[in-house]
Amino acid sequence: MPTHRHRHDIVVVGARAAGAATAQLLARLGYDVVLVDRAVFPADTVSTHQIARTGVVQLHRWGLLEAVLDSGAPAIRQVTFTVEGQSTTRAVKDKAGVDLLVAPRRYILDTLVAETAAAAGADLRLGVTITGVHLNDAGRATGVYGHDAAGAPVEIDARFVLGADGLRSRVARAVGAEIIEDRGDRGATQYAYYAGIPWDGIELIIADRALTGVFPTHDNQACIWICSPSTDARAARRRAASREDAFTASLDRAAPELARRLRAGRRTSPVTGMLRSPNVIRRAHGPGWALVGDAGCHRDPITGHGLSDAYRDAELLAVALDEALRGAAEEGSALAGYQQQRDEAVRDIFDLTCALADYPPAAEFVDLQKRLSAAIDAEAATLAAASVPDRREPAPA
């Protein structure tokens, strides 16, 4: 027998960055929210997990930043840029109410935000795989179906279905959310974790056809990553005996001084990542459904803004759904407003991402990085000035 046939306000498919953040905001607003994920937390995912200032602002506004720091993620207070062998170190300035950056491991961060959603009242169901979306005769999403970890069928009815299930979103496919912009998948990102070496802060190393970085994280380790054209990464794989050998060879070429330092420490994880990173924007809403996070917009990790995008868009969507559910705005108008706000917010950084993923000469790359920093600071200021959605009385039926 199918279970869970009570009609909820919202079911959120995907309990990581975008989904958990959206669910915790909607639960704070008093809605009956079900949050599901096929993983059982704590569980890791592919991510280099540095949170840009915009995302740190969101965590601070929602009251979660201290919990992230208390989890053992180090407060990052300086960034070192290296271009053509010349290094410059800059302090993280106090802007938009925050004076630090952070790069928590995803199995810790995602668990923390999902548990915050549950504490706010969301019904968190882990180990549940959603395989499809129920649509009525008019084409409106009315719920989702799938199975639990034991294979038992699960059906969840809801007034709204939110797809926060990542780049290869099943929700997006099920509702036919079309891609409205596709800028290709020419970039690759690979990373591994290293320990036994002191880390002073974030490091960004610009080289010919590569950007390499260091993100200090939990347990005195750092995420060491390299972004490069997909063609280069694939060629390195073909030349090497293993993924790890290819990664080491790429570091030797793009960041030799960092590679030398890494030999004094130890690698604590396999090398992982993506050899193709799509730059796509999907339609973000339709009758009874909406997409958030990578399900709606994904771009090359070279700008390190994916988590920040997810947290920004989670709030935009929560506000729009609140307006629709309490009748303050017509549903189509509210969700169209969400998509417009998302598209406007992502535009500059999306374009800069695509430009950086072309790996122009160093001087142009540095100029693009400066423009990226200005865009992030402007967005952070806008977010810091906004009111946090929070209304705990029951939502109207």
Feature-to-residue mapping (PLM):
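Beta1/beta-strand and adjacent pyrophosphate-binding region of the FAD-binding site
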Residues: 2-18
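Glycine-rich FAD pyrophosphate-binding loop
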Residues: 13, 27-47
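N-terminal FAD cofactor-binding segment of flavoenzymes
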Residues: 46-80
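Helix-loop-beta segment of a Rossmann-like dinucleotide-binding subdomain
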Residues: 87-104, 143-145, 227-230
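Short beta-strand to alpha-helix junction loop
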Residues: 95-115, 192, 237-241
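Predominantly flavin-linked oxidoreductase catalytic cores and closely associated redox partners
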Residues: 116-257
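FAD/FMN-dependent oxidoreductases across multiple families
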Residues: 238-320, 324-332
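C-terminal helical "tail/cap" subdomain of flavin- and related membrane-associated enzymes
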Residues: 319-397
